[in-house]
Amino acid sequence: MYYDKIISCIVSATENVIPHRKICGNEHNVTGWADYVEEKHDIARQAFLQWCHDGKPRLGPGYLHMYRSRAAFKQALRFCKRNKERLQADALALSYNNVDAKKFWKGVTTAANRKATANVNKISGAVGEQNICNMWCNHFRQLYNSVHTDSDKCAFYDTAANIDKQSPVRVTVADVRDAIAALKNTKAPGPNGVHTEAFKYAGFRLWTHLSLFYTFCLCHSYVPDNFMSINIVPLVKNKCGDLTDVNNYRAIALCNIDTKVLEKIVLAEVTTYHACDDHQFGFKKNHSTTLCTAAVKQTIDYYARRGSHVFVCFIDYSKAFDKVNYWKIFGQLLDDSVNSYIVLLLAYWYSHQQASVIWMNTRSSAFTVGNGTKQGGILSPYLFSRYIRLLLYKISVSKIGCHIGGMAANVFAYADDVVLLAPSWHGMQDLIAILTGCCKCLDLECNVRKTKCMVVNPISVDKTVRRTFPCFSINGQMIEFVTEFKYLGHILSAKMQDDCDITREIRNMYARTNMLVQRFRKCSLKVKLAIFKAYFMCFYGISLWWSFNVSTMLKFKYCYNKCVKKFFGYKKYDSATAVFMELKLPTANTVLHNHRSLFKACWKNHSNSIVSLIRDVYRPTPLS
């Protein structure tokens, strides 16, 4: 009752303060409406209403005024539609000159991602908006109740009944204020329809009521039903893929803003009890996919320089986030002496949450969520890291596989992307056996079809080795061997050459240039320079290009010069050096040097224990 009154007050205050203007027709789709069309549209509308009031005469001054005002309105509308690109370019230039960075980059992103997408009327045999929504509801109901958790639930409550309860956590007004301030604006609201801005600008009185409400929830390990409701929105993974395939969608959970505030407060409390494993590079500050890939490549290079083969296994999980058994996570939290009031609150919260699917303008019936972590939730990254910690720990302490300076470098993970490293076939098979046992314990399922293995030795690649050693298997299914694999966006090859990844970036650069030229060819030079620095100087994985053929790098530099000249409207036979000097832009060599220098500084000063060990023990590295 108390919670419902708080939310109803926020909703009523929002409706009274924020005006809701209904958009009619295609008004919001016309670029330049406010500057060129709106005034003439109002005049034409008033003239039309006056003409109707006069009885719709076919002659006279009233008819002429209506006719001419409508003609002026239609002419302005045609002008905006015919000059849409120029008007968009002028709007970008105006926001750039006014130093309105948020509006400028919002316009750039909108124009860059503009793509005609047809409405999907059929998915997995379901036709029609309502039938598709019901299909999604049945699909997610089955997915989020696919793990048997009864035994783990009983074990958790038995453990919770036998521990000594600590003092309950008190939520202060400062905690609520800091949690609300940390939330991002312009995010989609939850089921109650309240936006983040309503909480940020409500003031001290609302924060006081929320602190009391959150304290009551923690003391009694209870939250209202409306507090736990979530909306599930299926989003497309690959827009160029099959839009009628269920597996081409991922579920994003939208919860209430007040729920996110409590998640922020709980996250700040539980993180003080646990430090994440250094083998996990995901969901951690100052860690990135580039750092994880660099650690993998350095470990392989450490063994390759000593003439040893390295077996690499890239593990792919099937619905890892959606099949998390959260009762095991709560049991781990109790074992780590996390405040029992927080753990019991999370247990009640996750075991009673209700979800509904939103598809276009249709909402499905609610269903109970029995397993899985919410993709998009604030607590979800922390809970998944705790869940997969057991797997990483057992592999790292097994003393099997690659080691550097006495520390295990046999497993690296970025979220659910796990890679195993071993210098021998027996070692890799033992690591796979340990991983399979941990997956059974954690109710995780390996996708053998997408799991790949690769044998690496850039010094002496012996083809007979691949023919003589047996294949690896998971649950009786053979794992395919490959010579190239795209791990975290970077292509790793059996010869540890980066030519394939450079070729990938060349293709991406050509495609990106064609898109930008089409979208922004009528923009001013200042706008083009800003867009160039954002889209042409941030190459993913460029700091990991350590070994490559000279001809491949020359192709990359030629592609870079060609794209610069095309984007800024120069002739293809113009001198690239003169273009760079005139526009004061960095050359390809400068971009490469800057990226390598920044990553080298990050590598040398990083606090991760594995990165520090590789840096200190293994001196002759490409980053030295």
Regions found by a protein language model. Name each.
Residues 190, 229-232, 250, 280, ...:
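Catalytic palm active-site di-aspartate
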Residues 186-194, 232, 244-254, 291-331:
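Conserved catalytic palm subdomain of right-hand nucleotidyl-transferase polymerases, strongest
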Residues 7, 22-26, 30, 85, ...:
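Non-catalytic, peripheral interaction segments enriched in hydrophobic/basic residues
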Residues 7, 11, 207, 244-278, ...:
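Conserved pre-motif C helix in the palm subdomain of viral-like polymerases
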Residues 166, 361, 445-483:
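Short, conserved micro-motifs composed of acidic
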Residues 1-125, 561-562:
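Arg/Lys-enriched, amphipathic patches
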Residues 9-12, 99-246, 253, 257-261, ...:
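Surface-exposed loop/turn segments and immediately adjacent short secondary-structure elements
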Residues 317-415, 420-430, 449:
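Conserved polymerase palm-domain catalytic core
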